[in-house]
């Protein structure tokens, strides 16, 4: 996968995008990450990238020309127009796991990181997606882009040591992940549930499903509305409701 990031602060990406899973993906050549400063594409000697809004208003807006020329340079380099150009915007659609899965199917993504008060509206005509990290405002789009890149890249084949890890993560199944334990079996009188140490894989799978349902029911009941429930899951959910009422 190739990812291009358009930003005014490329150095912000040097550390986070060179470590851990993303760093390893780049080392394995599973990910090509290019970060460009769209100030370099400004057409005036002062390299201005923002200006006052027509009609008045608070703050400065990002100009259309530098971002347009930066996108055109990417198109010329790759000999094709990127299929997904993502604008980081507080007014955009909230980012979620399903969106990360969609992005992971693409060969090329472009992220545009905003700054200042906002964008010249004409920039929006150049993008395919307007995405927000959540219902709050950050100084710029850089941190949001890093989060989305991380969530997307870890879904690529062979990026994680165990591909099953991405499939069983919280949100990937529509449910929050069940509790997990490692050695020792007893620590400060806190014991690992016996079912996990008895070697009965059928009982373990049932416990994991039930506890995944329980955690989702208690912490994010809204997620259950979009889960396609099997008869077994419905039965377990009723048991959970009765247990939690005691």
Swiss-Prot record:
One Pfam family this sequence matches: tRNA_m1G_MT
Leader peptide range in chain numbering: none
Protein name as it appears in the record: tRNA (guanine-N(1)-)-methyltransferase
Function: Specifically methylates guanosine-37 in various tRNAs.
Record note on quaternary structure: Homodimer.
Swiss-Prot/TrEMBL catalytic activity: guanosine(37) in tRNA + S-adenosyl-L-methionine = N(1)-methylguanosine(37) in tRNA + S-adenosyl-L-homocysteine + H(+)
Taxonomic lineage: Bacteria, Bacillati, Bacillota, Bacilli, Lactobacillales
Keyword Cytoplasm in annotation: yes
Protein encoded by which gene: trmD
Gene Ontology biological process terms in this record: tRNA N1-guanine methylation
Family membership noted in the UniProt record: Belongs to the RNA methyltransferase TrmD family.
EC category: transferase
Alphabetically ordered keywords of this record: Cytoplasm, Methyltransferase, S-adenosyl-L-methionine, Transferase, tRNA processing
């Amino acid at each position: 996968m190739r990812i291009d990031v358009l930003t005014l602060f490329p150095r912000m990406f040097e550390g986070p995008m060179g470590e851990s899973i993303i760093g390893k993906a780049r080392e394995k050549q599973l990910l090509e990450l290019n970060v460009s400063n769209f100030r370099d594409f400004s057409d005036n000697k002062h390299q201005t990238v923002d200006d006052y809004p027509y009609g008045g208003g608070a703050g400065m807006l990002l100009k259309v020309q530098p971002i347009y020329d930066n996108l055109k340079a990417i198109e010329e380099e790759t000999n094709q127009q990127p299929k997904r150009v993502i604008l980081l915007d507080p007014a955009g659609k909230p980012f979620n796991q399903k969106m990360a899965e969609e992005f992971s199917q693409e060969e090329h993504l472009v992220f545009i990181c905003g700054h200042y008060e906002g964008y010249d509206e004409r920039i929006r005509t150049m993008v395919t997606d307007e995405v927000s990290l959540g219902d709050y405002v950050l100084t710029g789009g850089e941190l949001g882009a890093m989060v989305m890149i991380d969530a997307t890249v870890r879904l690529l084949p062979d990026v994680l040591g165990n591909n099953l890890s991405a499939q069983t993560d919280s949100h990937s199944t529509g449910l929050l992940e069940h509790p997990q334990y490692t050695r020792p079996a007893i620590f400060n009188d806190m014991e690992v549930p016996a079912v996990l140490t008895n070697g009965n894989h059928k009982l373990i799978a049932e416990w994991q499903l039930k506890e995944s349902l329980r955690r989702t029911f208690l912490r994010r009941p809204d997620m259950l509305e979009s889960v396609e429930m099997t008869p077994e899951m419905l039965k377990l959910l009723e048991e959970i409701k009765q247990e939690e009422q005691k």
